């Protein structure tokens, strides 16, 4: 079967090596569920439902979490099917859960930013409790118009997310939130 302890040790070591390889800054897109990945534990016997979280906890002194959420998901009040809560409320739940485990949440990035009262209220709520917010904008032609994407009209328009730690974990309440685009924008 799957050796969970060996997995945690090897993955953590590999991430440390990557951080050193990339000038002490690594952006790591974390998709899927961090707290309760029962699907992975079903298809991979021996994989614990919280293995990803346990790996992060081994790196917590180096790690900073950035949570991304699409403006459209805020505006439409998109609901997580598993928890029955909206994505914006899930961001608040994730912040509390990460902080409760001793992990540092550096900021929240609103992706595909659109000015709307719901988005402004969400940003205000986060700022009022000390969570910094950043904005990434819609890029016409994304993902096919590479020349525009990697220009001042593309990633260059986005806020640069100021981070403090060498491992920046980009996560989100659900798929399609812009995790990978956020990583790429930071590199730009």
Language-model-detected regions and their locations in the chain:
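Glycine-rich phosphate-binding loop of ATP-dependent small-molecule kinases
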Residues: 1, 158, 188
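Pre-Walker A adenine-sensing motif
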Residues: 13-17, 151-163
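Short, glycine/acidic-rich beta->alpha junctions
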Residues: 48, 118, 162, 178-182
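N-terminal pre-Walker A segment at the start of P-loop NTPase domains
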Residues: 136-156
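Pre-Walker A (Motif I) flank of P-loop NTPase domains
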Residues: 24, 164-168
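Long, basic/Gly/Ser/Thr-rich N-terminal segments
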Residues: 1-141
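Glycine-rich phosphate-binding P-loop
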Residues: 167-187
């Amino acid at each position: 079967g799957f050796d969970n302890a060996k997995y945690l040790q090897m993955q953590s070591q590999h991430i440390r090596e990557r951080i050193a390889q990339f000038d002490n800054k690594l952006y790591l897109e974390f998709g899927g569920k961090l707290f309760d990945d029962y699907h992975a534990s079903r298809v991979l016997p021996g994989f614990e439902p919280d293995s990803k979280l346990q790996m992060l906890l081994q790196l917590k002194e180096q790690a900073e979490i950035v949570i991304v959420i699409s403006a459209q998901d805020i505006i439409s009040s998109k609901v997580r099917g598993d928890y029955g809560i909206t994505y914006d409320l899930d961001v608040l739940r994730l912040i509390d859960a990460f902080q409760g485990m001793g992990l540092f949440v550096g900021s929240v990035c609103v992706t595909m930013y659109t000015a709307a009262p719901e988005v402004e209220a969400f940003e205000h709520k986060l700022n009022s409790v000390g969570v910094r917010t950043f904005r990434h904008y819609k890029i016409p032609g994304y993902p096919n118009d590479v020349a525009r994407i990697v220009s001042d009209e593309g990633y260059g328009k986005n806020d640069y997310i100021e981070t403090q730690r060498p491992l920046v974990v980009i996560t989100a309440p659900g798929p399609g939130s812009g995790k990978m685009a956020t990583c790429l924008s930071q590199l730009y």
